[in-house]
Regions:
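Conserved non-catalytic scaffold segment of RNase H-like nuclease domains
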Residues: 1-122
Length: 124
């Protein structure tokens, strides 16, 4: 996939999360999708389900359609964290409502794993 109309100075990662709930401190990511627009116009898309290590409340499952059974054999965030951090390296971050929810949730998940793994400095 190519995007030719964006004039990027660095890659832009558009992030969408599905989670066990909306409490950033307590809830966990169960699916992440990242569409990364590179400065050469190419786009990479990665989607991964994640085992949250906790039950998914039925109220959340009814919204996003992801149930405990769907993630029971998936890797944990800790198992994916390093490769995800590498994929997001040097990217600005974007997404719908991302500054209020998705980015804080993502940062919190990285902090649970390793505080030095993911850095928000120099990102927009």
């Amino acid at each position: 996939m190519q995007m030719h109309s964006l004039k990027l100075k660095k890659p832009l990662a558009v992030i969408d999360l599905e989670t066990t709930g909306i409490n950033v401190a307590k809830d966990r990511i169960i699916e992440i999708c990242v569409a990364k627009a590179n400065i050469d116009g190419s786009v990479e898309v990665k989607t991964k389900r994640i085992n949250p290590g906790m039950p998914i409340p039925i109220e959340s499952s009814l919204i996003h359609g992801i149930y405990d059974e769907d993630v029971k054999d998936e890797p944990t965030f800790k198992q994916l964290a390093r490769s995800l951090a590498q994929f997001l390296e040097g990217c600005d971050l974007a997404g719908f409502n991302s500054n209020r929810f998705d980015i804080p949730m993502l940062v919190e998940e990285f902090l649970r794993v390793d505080s030095d793994l993911f850095d928000m400095k120099n990102r927009k």
